[in-house]
Amino acid sequence: MTNLDRHLSKFAYREEFAGNTEVLATAAYKEDCADASTGLTPKLPLEVEFGKMSKRPDWIKVKAPNSSEYYNTKDLIKNLKLNTVCEEAACPNIGECWSKKHATVMILGSVCTRACRFCNVKTGRPDLLDPHEPQRLAEAVQKLGLKHVVITSVDRDDLEDGGATHFAECISEIRKSSPNTTIEILTPDFLRKDGAAEIIANAKPDVFNHNVETVPSLYNTIRPGARYYNSLSLLHNIKKLSPEVFTKSGMMVGLGEEISEVVQVMDDLREAKVDFLTIGQYLQPTKNHAEVAKYVTPEEFKYLERVARTKGFLMVSASPLTRSSYHADEDFEKLKENYRHRHCEERRSIDVAIS
């Protein structure tokens, strides 16, 4: 049994046995998250508050979109009847990304079966699957001339495979019409969906992304329908099934977590062989969502990035406005270059050792 397997089994037992209740989940995390350098258990965050909107600092503010390319992208997406997480999740980077003809398409409908406290996507009974969506998505990719496309989705707990087959069909259609386009998918956790990881791995995306979103001690409040261990396990399984696929995960800060907890998540993700980590500021979409506990400064983000780089990630992106698919095309090129560089360094080390 690997270190990760032992770590996952502890979370699996506690979360399932406890029904993910706050007291036991917190107790479990306190045991697992003792600071390795001091032996001390970090102070756990206060209860997350709802019902109040806090003022955003200057470093969070962005310009309103007004370019012609922005509106061209908006019209194309509308005409092809596609959903985007850019709109549904009220992403602050929508103006910049759409002006560059970059959009993260959201498949499987616009209604989610989960009710995460950070997310602005609608929750409720989802619509029937649209069998023509993969073809429309492929058409949009071709018309936009995308070199790199990011596909995400709502959670579909109502589907037998959680929507994994639909993801695979989207990848297949894009490969047919845009064979040179690289494909990044940002999936749900496929909780209790046996075989979903295998379907995704066999579809061979260039990048597999699944966000852990926050630290384990906040799951019960912020991400109540999910399990931290399941997210780690999914990332690890994809890497085992398709080692050539880059894996990626992201999290938000500013929800009340301690830095030591964030560092522990970094360690867990590296144990799961994750290549690329993104860290961004949580922004409260409406007063009905979790309140921002803290606006993390740009300097603190730089610190987190430095720490993450020491853990061995191929790529780290950490800033107030960092989101999973922000600058995804540029980051993918850097990711490949970093991989080649590390591979060459390892090869040289082996050659030196042999000689």
UniProtKB/Swiss-Prot annotation:
**UniProt xrefs under InterPro entries:** Aldolase_TIM, Elp3/MiaA/NifB-like_rSAM, LIAS_N, Lipoyl_synth, RPE1, rSAM
Pathway annotation from the record: Protein modification; protein lipoylation via endogenous pathway; protein N(6)-(lipoyl)lysine from octanoyl-[acyl-carrier-protein]: step 2/2
Domain RPE1 insert, which positions? 7-55
Q: What residues bind [4Fe-4S] cluster 1, as annotated?
A: C86, C91, C97, S325
Keywords, in A-Z order: 4Fe-4S, Cytoplasm, Iron, Iron-sulfur, Metal-binding, S-adenosyl-L-methionine, Transferase
A Gene Ontology molecular-function term?
Answer: 4 iron, 4 sulfur cluster binding
Q: What is its main location?
A: cytoplasm
**HAMAP family membership:** Lipoyl_synth (MF_00206)
Q: Which NCBIfam families match?
A: lipA, PRK05481.1, PRK12928.1, RPE1
- How is this protein named in the record? Lipoyl synthase
According to its UniProt entry, this protein's organism is Rickettsia bellii (strain RML369-C)
Q: What is the lineage of its organism?
A: Bacteria, Pseudomonadati, Pseudomonadota, Alphaproteobacteria, Rickettsiales
